[in-house]
Amino acid sequence: MGLAMGEREEVAMTKHNLERFFPYHTNHYPQALREIKAGEKGSHWIWYIFPQIKGLGTSSRSVKFGIENADEAREYLAHPILGHDLREITSALLELKENDPVKVMGWEIDAVKLKSCMTLFAYVSEEGSVFHKVLEKFFGGEMDEATLDLLKK
């Protein structure tokens, strides 16, 4: 139940400047979803598809697309495009037979970013969410401590 490409860019944005994710997210999401469904990330889109809490990375993309706090993470999940797509691509991870995050994400650093993203959104979601399930499947249920530390500040 997603929006058509033209509709995706007309959705009203929110107080946390979620419009910074567009057009990057819109342009790369279909490819990202194909790669995840195939079980092998091969291109560079992680910052605006699986965002992390701001403060973990220092690259310009990590800073630009970093989520400020739990309130912004909730707003991201409530967004009709960003929240829908994050849940959809996260659910696609659960459908894979592979449970090694490095094999799926292609690089150790991207596996770490995935864990950080899942921790962020699990933190603001009810127990048993798709984010908790991905943490269980790929990381033995362990959350990212650095993400939790930043969320508690």
Annotated model-derived regions:
Residues 1-12:
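Short, Lys/Arg-enriched N-terminal segments with co-localized hydrophobic residues
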Residues 14-31:
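Short, conserved active-site entrance elements at the starts or edges of catalytic domains
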Residues 33, 74, 118-119, 136:
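Amphipathic alpha-helical segments within well-ordered protein domains
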Residues 35-70:
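Hydrophobic/aromatic-rich, well-ordered segments within soluble, folded domains that form packed cores
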Residues 41-48, 85, 110-117, 130, ...:
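Residue-level detector of well-ordered alpha-helical segments, enriched
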Residues 55-61, 122-132:
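Short helix-capping/linker segments at secondary-structure and domain boundaries
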Residues 75-121:
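Mid-chain, well-packed structural core segment of small domains
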Residues 126-153:
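Charged phosphate-binding loop/patch that engages nucleotide di/tri-phosphates or the phosphate backbone
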